């Protein structure tokens, strides 16, 4: 990527028309709370697979991954191993960053079983590239949707893998979209809510702002009795 002649874009209607809505609302909220400018470096491609956001060495270190399939020339470029990493991440590595936001997963429900280790390895790689071993990594759990060409449980198992990754990746955080998904539209319209939830998470965990509800209800256990399931949640002091 050639950055010559490029400059930071000021937040204005003409600049944000093509900006990620989630990223915009995230930055807007953080700016308002901290009263400081927030810059966004947006490296994204709709529908990309996680394999495309890491290099081959990283992906090859993960058990259960088919490297040959991931590098296949039959794949779309944004699905192919290393493509997004080489073209959209590596070129911006010299920008100082405060943290990463990640909103992806829908294109990987077919291999949910290795998603948690793939995301863990990817985050480790990115932190090594930025020479920041504890850089915050906040991500969005995929929304409920009737995904085509998949088993009914695949998306739920991918969400479960995202929760598992939360337990493995240090200094990470996840926001849920379970209440704002759309069965028939893979792009839920309430991007402002997603951005606000990510901002609240960052304000709490990175900027140490107290008193914000930064985490949604999290199931901790289930007990079964007389044909009923009794579910216990954390982070639900105000109820579900």
For the regions a language model picked out, list residue spans one by one.
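Cell-envelope and extracellular/periplasmic
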Residues: 1-240
């Amino acid at each position: 990527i050639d950055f010559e002649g490029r400059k930071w874009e000021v937040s204005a209607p003409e600049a944000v028309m093509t900006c990620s809505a989630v990223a915009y609302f995230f930055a807007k909220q953080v700016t308002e709370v901290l009263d400081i400018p927030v810059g966004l470096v947006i490296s994204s491609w709709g529908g990309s697979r996680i394999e495309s956001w890491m290099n081959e060495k990283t992906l090859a270190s993960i058990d259960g991954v088919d490297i040959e399939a991931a590098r296949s020339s039959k794949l779309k470029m944004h699905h192919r191993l290393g493509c997004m990493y080489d073209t959209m991440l590596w070129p911006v590595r010299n920008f100082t960053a405060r943290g990463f936001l990640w909103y992806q997963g829908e294109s990987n429900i077919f291999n949910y079983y290795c998603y948690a280790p793939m995301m863990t390895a990817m985050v480790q790689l990115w932190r090594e590239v930025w020479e920041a071993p504890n850089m915050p990594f906040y991500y969005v759990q995929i929304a409920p949707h009737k995904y085509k060409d998949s088993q009914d449980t695949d998306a739920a198992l991918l969400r479960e893998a995202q929760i598992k990754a939360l337990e493995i990746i240090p200094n990470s955080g996840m926001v849920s979209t379970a209440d704002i998904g759309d069965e028939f539209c893979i792009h839920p319209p309430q991007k402002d809510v997603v951005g606000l939830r990510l901002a609240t998470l960052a304000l709490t965990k990175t900027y140490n702002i107290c008193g914000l509800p930064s985490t949604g209800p999290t199931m901790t256990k289930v007990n079964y009795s007389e044909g009923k399931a009794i579910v216990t949640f954390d982070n639900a002091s105000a109820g579900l």
